[in-house]
Amino acid sequence: MATTYEEFAAKLDRLDAEFAKKMEEQNKRFFADKPDEATLSPEMKEHYEKFEKMIQEHTDKFNKKMREHSEHFKAKFAELLEQQKNAQFPGK
């Protein structure tokens, strides 16, 4: 079965969105058991805030990298389709 560029791109976009959603859900679960801020010392509160920020930055960076890879795969797939078309229909 031949796959069109649109099908391939849509699948990658869907997978990227699913992955980003799963990462966000995982982060929410990870921080769900955070102690009540009222019980934390200022140092521990600062520690939690820094840690949450770091986790979010890494998640954002990872999601961005996944999107970049998807764009690269889309470009390569388009190249392969073009090569295949040129091989099947030379001169067109």
Swiss-Prot record:
Main location: cytoplasm
Subcellular location: Cytoplasm, Cytoskeleton
Biological-process GO terms, alphabetical: ciliary basal body organization; cytoskeleton organization; defense response; positive regulation of cell population proliferation
Entry keywords, A to Z: Cytoplasm, Cytoskeleton, Microtubule
GO cellular component, one term: axoneme
Coiled-coil blocks: none
Pfam families assigned to the protein according to its UniProt record, in alphabetical order: KMP11 (PF03037)
InterPro entries found in the cross-reference section: KMP11 (IPR004132)
Function recorded in the entry: May be involved in the regulation of the cytoskeleton through interaction with the subpellicular microtubules. May be involved in parasite mobility and attachment to the surface of the host cell. Behaves as a strong immunogen during infection.
Similarity annotation: Belongs to the KMP-11 family.
Misc. remarks from the entry: There are four copies of the KMP-11 gene in T.b.brucei.
Assembly with partners or alone: Monomer.
Protein name: Kinetoplastid membrane protein 11
The species this protein was found in: Trypanosoma brucei brucei
Gene this protein is translated from: KMP-11/1
